[in-house]
A protein has these predicted regions:
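Extended, charged coiled-coil "arm/hinge" scaffolds of SMC/Rad50-like chromosome-maintenance ATPases
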Residues: 208-239
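Charged/polar positions within long, soluble alpha-helices
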Residues: 58, 86, 90-93, 163, ...
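Amphipathic alpha-helix face/heptad-repeat signature
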Residues: 74-77, 230, 248, 252-255
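Structured, charged N-terminal subsegments at the starts of enzyme catalytic cores
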Residues: 150-216
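Conserved amphipathic alpha-helical "coupling/scaffold" segments
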Residues: 1-165
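Conserved NTPase motor "head" modules and their coupling/switch loops across ABC/AAA+ ATPases, GTPases
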Residues: 255-321
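Amphipathic alpha-helical coiled-coil segments and their boundaries
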Residues: 67-70, 74, 220, 227, ...
Length: 321
């Protein structure tokens, strides 16, 4: 689990819900995910996508941000938003991981999946509305072109004049390139280089607090101006998608993480021969508790990770209470 998400998950586990209706609601979701390999895999795949989406949505406000930076951030937000919607749409329609023969990764036939939980039914209905949104359909059409405009910017070429003492005295921005530069190596020196290979090692930026070279200040200003001009068509196109927002997925991230972890746990223990069953919730105040085969789940996890996991039922003994 990402360190930044440990707090919410810890609170959820240390202060468990006691409302029977909510518990049943969540167990329905867990049943659906455990019973559908493709849907649970979709949820796992969504975690890093939503993490990236959150990064581009919750960025700090910068008064000095250029139009180029604002445009790139918004475009990346829409890119990850579209990926979330497409993944969910494929999963709910039974086509997640669909192969050429029409089957999905777990061998089952593609087709709309059967859901029991109200939560996932509502999420499917929401996904259906999002995919039918004309703005979203236009986004899918325009997104490859808009991303290509940004992604092709890989490098800039700078020309530097030297004075009589061979010190840099003047600089000019020459080109914006579609290939990244690389440093030189022995192999490059032996076979020759193309225009993107340097004649010395490639150096990374040092952000250790050193002041910028005065020569670089106007150069960076020119670079910002060029970049702003480059993304002007993209910025204009993005105004069409102002109604699209991925915050709903960011709000779901902690819930998705919880269910992903729960599904992994159930499947892990089941694969080692340990039962995991849905409890029957007694009404509040009933004062009854009955269980058969109760076992120490911490021991089961630790022993189950050993090479001889198949022998787990004989090593972790359950008790009836």
């Amino acid at each position: 689990v990402d360190k930044s998400r440990e707090g919410p998950l810890r609170d959820l586990l240390l202060e468990p819900c006691r409302d029977p209706a909510v518990i049943e609601y969540r167990l329905d979701v867990l049943d659906d995910l455990v019973g559908n390999e493709a849907l649970s895999r979709c949820f796992e795949d969504l975690v890093p996508v939503i993490g990236a989406l959150s990064y581009f949505i919750s960025r700090p406000e910068h008064d000095d941000w250029s139009p180029f930076q604002e445009t790139v951030w918004r475009l990346r937000e829409l890119e990850h938003y579209a990926e979330c919607v497409k993944k969910l749409d494929a999963a709910f329609s039974g086509g997640y991981g669909k192969a050429a023969d029409g089957s999905v990764a777990d061998g089952s036939a593609a087709g709309e999946i059967v859901l029991r939980s109200d939560a996932l039914k509502r999420l499917r209905a929401l996904t259906t509305r999002l995919t039918a949104d004309p703005a979203f359909m236009r986004l899918l059409e325009r997104l490859p072109e808009l991303l290509e405009t940004i992604d092709r910017i890989k490098s800039v070429t700078i020309g530097v004049n030297l004075n009589g003492a061979l010190q840099p005295c003047e600089a000019v921005l020459l080109t914006v390139g579609s290939k990244s530069f690389t440093g030189s190596g022995l192999y490059d020196k032996l076979i020759g280089r193309d225009g993107t290979h340097g004649i010395a090692p490639l150096h990374s930026a040092d952000t250790g607090g050193f002041a910028a070279n005065p020569l670089m200040v106007p150069l960076f200003r020119d670079l910002a101006m060029v970049m702003n001009r480059t993304v002007q068509p993209v910025a204009a196109a993005l105004k069409e998608f102002v109604s699209l927002n991925g915050r709903m997925f960011v709000r779901l991230r902690d819930e998705i993480l919880f269910y992903v972890g729960a599904v992994r746990l159930v499947r892990f223990l089941n694969s080692r021969g340990m039962p995991m069953v849905r409890p029957l919730i007694e009404p509040p105040g009933a004062g009854r508790f009955s269980v058969r085969g109760l076992y120490n789940i911490d021991l089961a996890i630790r022993f189950g990770r050993e090479a001889d996991g198949a022998s787990l039922p004989s090593r972790v003994v359950g008790s009836d209470l």
